[in-house]
From Swiss-Prot:
Broad class of where this protein is predominantly found: endoplasmic reticulum
Protein name: Diacylglycerol O-acyltransferase 2A
PANTHER family (alphabetical): ACYLTRANSFERASE, DIACYLGLYCEROL O-ACYLTRANSFERASE
Annotated Gene Ontology cellular component terms: endoplasmic reticulum membrane
Statement: the UniProt record of this protein carries the keyword Kinase: no
Residues passing through the membrane, by range: 41-61, 62-78
UniProt keyword annotation of Heme present: no
Record's catalysed reaction(s): an acyl-CoA + a 1,2-diacyl-sn-glycerol = a triacyl-sn-glycerol + CoA
Length: 355
């Protein structure tokens, strides 16, 4: 019996020794790095903060109930701002706080071609990653110098319509320039916003977030025709945009298509419009576990615009859409091939269009 107990103790000891000890962040780091971490922490927590404030206000007896009821009625019935360009606050886009946010990774933008400010554009952003932080840095702030690189272009990053049903958080999103990704919203921004008014769509959406893993760029694009149809309807040129480093910000639990986990995630997506990848990044005081993204450079390549082709005699609208879709996919592949050896040296596989 004693030998069995000793054997068990030895086994437990070896198991514990095999578990890597967490890597803690040093206490003495430059103040700027602390502020960068704080900026990202607040950004990641903003939905929770807004919901906490809202429910706290609801808990105050009687005094605020009537204004809160009016506010909720206004959100659900009258306010159509998310589908009409939102309510962006210009100074917020240029706030120095976003420099700290972008400097955390750090995030960069590389321009391939000038964009005519008299035209409208649809930026297709790839990959989705877990939270699409690179898209926010690029299109919702001026921290990476977007406004200087593309003068006269006024982009709105689009997100799920359901996000604009969350009290207070919806107002924060619109203040940052975000709008709904609905068809109506896309058309309103591109046709009523004037010259230079543009939209940025994270094309892969929730499905692609399940493919987000370091060293991999599996894109959901083969059957994504919605943004192509919007381009044909509005005449807006397509601009392929690839971010190297987006998928490196978090690590995700592996789940193949036949696993129970993957099926569960897909059911959530069909029911709610978004999915729940099981991921982890780092914490405030450690490098191995938490909800903060890892510090990894993000290089966003903004490609050359692809104009909507003119309709040839006898050509149908569906043929135009498919032709433009093929051109866009080739442009994305070409963009990846030209920069992969610079910004994706540690990749474990090449770009693949999986859906």
């Amino acid at each position: 019996m004693a030998s069995k107990d000793q054997h068990l103790q030895q086994k437990v000891k070896h198991t514990l020794e095999a578990i890597p000890s967490p890597r803690y962040a040093p206490l003495r780091v430059p103040l700027r790095r602390r502020l960068q971490t704080l900026a990202v922490l607040l950004w990641c927590s903003m939905m929770s903060i807004c919901m906490f404030i809202f429910f706290f206000l609801c808990s105050i007896p009687v005094l605020l109930w009537f204004p809160i009821i009016l506010y909720l009625t206004w959100i659900l019935v009258w306010d159509k701002a998310p589908e009409n360009g939102g309510r962006p606050i210009r100074w917020l886009r240029n706030a120095a706080w976003w420099k700290l946010f972008a400097g955390y990774f750090p995030a960069h933008v590389i321009k391939e071609a000038d964009l005519d400010p008299s035209k409208n554009y649809i930026f297709g952003y790839h990959p989705h990653g877990i939270i699409s932080m690179g898209s926010f840095c690029t299109f919702s702030t001026n921290a990476t110098g977007f406004d200087d690189l593309f003068p006269g272009i006024r982009p709105s990053l689009l997100t799920l319509t359901s996000n604009f049903n969350i009290p207070l958080y919806r107002d924060y999103l619109m203040a940052c320039g975000l709008c709904s990704v609905s068809k109506t919203s896309c058309q309103n921004i591109l046709t009523k916003g004037g010259p230079g008014r543009s939209i940025a769509i994270v094309v892969g959406g929730a499905s692609e977030s399940l493919n987000a893993r370091p060293g991999v760029m599996d894109l959901v694009l083969k059957r994504r025709f919605g943004f192509i149809k919007i381009a044909v309807q509005t005449g807006a040129s397509l601009v392929p945009t690839i971010s190297f480093g987006e998928n490196e910000l978090y690590e995700q639990i592996e789940s193949n298509e036949n696993s129970k986990l993957h099926r569960w995630q897909k059911k959530i997506q069909h029911a709610l419009g978004f999915t729940m990848p099981l991921f982890h990044g780092r914490g405030v005081f450690n490098y191995d576990f938490g909800l903060l993204p890892h510090r990894h450079p993000i290089y966003t390549i903004v490609g050359k615009p692809i104009p909507v082709p003119s309709i040839k005699y006898g050509q149908t609208k569906d043929e135009i859409i498919r032709e433009l879709h093929d051109s866009y996919m080739h442009a994305v592949q070409d963009l990846y091939d030209r920069y992969k050896d610079i910004y994706a040296k540690d990749r474990v596989k090449e770009l693949e269009f999986v859906e």
